[in-house]
Amino acid sequence: MANRRLRHAPHTATDEFHQALRRLFAPLCVHEDHFHVQLVIGRGALQPEEAAVETSQPPAQFAAQTSAVLQQQLVHHVPRSCVLHLFVTDKRFLNRELGDRLYQRFLREWLVCRQAEREAVTALFQRMVMTKPYFVFLAYVYSMDCLHTVAVRTMAFLRFERYDTDYLLRRLRLYPPERLHALLDGVTVSLLGDLHRFLFGVDLRLPVLHPTSSPCLALLRAKRFDARADLAVYHRNQWCHQRQPRSPQLRGLIAALRRHAGKVPCGNPLYVLARQAVQTFCDTCPRYLVPLRALGLHDETRGGGSTAAAAAVGHAGAGQQAHHVEPTKIVLFALSAALRGGLIGSVIDLPLWCLCRLKCERHLDARSLVAVVCRQCGHCLNLGKEKLHCQQNFPLNSMFYYRDRQEKSVIFNTHAELVHCSLCGSQRVVRQRVYELVSETLFGQRCVRVGWKAVLGLNAACAVYDHRLAFDVILPCAARTCDSTVVVRGVTVPRLLRLTSHGHGLLCARCQTGEYRDSCLESEDGAPLCRGCALVKQTACHVGGHIVQQARGGLAATSSSSSPHGLPHV
């Protein structure tokens, strides 16, 4: 069988196999610009045909709105095809078209390679002909070696630093011969997934940090950090239970709680209080540390976090290898809260390149340009019926929230006078201004902070880190005397940044009809200038007679259909 020959393979044969594999797959791989790292974290997971820029506009009109740098990128755009794209797990089946293209490119390298390289690749698994299933298997081995390189050099928390080619070949010797023979004869997603689980103990998932309904961060699932009532503490770089005896006051408190609680299934009130304290701390503190020890994303649960497992770690001898035991569930909840705060959101802060875009405060009030955002699920709740497209999203059954309601609005409880999110049921609903002008004092100097923001239709604001991804946003109207918003379709991050510079803003439907309103600069009533107009008066754009105009073509702008002002007044 295939792995009988593998059992007795010398170490030199393994080295020759590794070197030949790297040489043959190097032309099929993309190494520059940290492409493998981007693929692992989700930025490079798009297929080449999906990543290509498409436009239905005439070339002249499209070039008129595009900068010189972006025009050069579009003209000379070459889709980057990497062999790791073959194992992106966004579909249930391997990409046949991509596999055929890579297989044809590999055969060109295979026909011109040296005879020693052919023997090193085929003799280890007793293959006489380079078939497509065997090519896919070799591509999988090469991809695991690339993940090992990424983990060693850049992302050690992936726990792939010990999964090199030597480790993989050693584990293949223990794989059942009939299953390996079936895999080499015909590679399927099911067989490849079984092999990956046998080798590494986890499901095959690429990108590793992709927001899916079955999140790769298994230690962050709700059923994991909300199902046990342990009291493990972090002591001497390991997780163990408290060894010191309880004080009389603590014993009295526990006894009193037990007497009054009885057998009422009230859960764990102390844990609920601790969760609320951790959530508030993570929301209010800009920086904090979550003690995770050496746990990685691919570590399996050893002992299930039980008391016996935690005690075994605490009493492990110096010569005995201690197993990785999960930290206590409150620490896992803190990690989930930290990831939620860094990944989930629907409001994007934009830089303001010119002060001539400041609005006149005469036409703004406390309810103008306000977005109601849920801090728990990250969705904007006052979009109304506006449909905004975005490819990135954290689905409802992910690790962050668990309810299954599709509408996004605010529920007001008149009995208790509480506000709830209709999507996840959380009470952590906040108001964020899409445009604001705040006066501050820094180091004795009076300063003005300008906030210009964009609102997404989904809760994956981290999609802005992918400069090739197109999405829909809601922006404040570019007119200085308007408190309405516009919907911008199919915008990317480079094009979104140009919308905050002078002369490139989009106007709402009301301003496009020619409705004119005076600002403080045009008013003749002798009233003092507002803060925005006072700053605009000092800009070079105003002195030189600059007039804010609508951006030319390329971006479809429509007024929001939910209300006359895009985002409803709050």
UniProtKB/Swiss-Prot annotation:
InterPro entries: UL49. One of its GO terms (cellular component) is viral tegument. It holds the Pfam family Herpes_UL49_1. GO terms for biological process: viral process. It comes from the Viruses. Signal peptide: none annotated. Belongs to the herpesviridae UL49 family. This is Protein UL49. It comes from Human cytomegalovirus (strain Merlin). The gene is UL49.
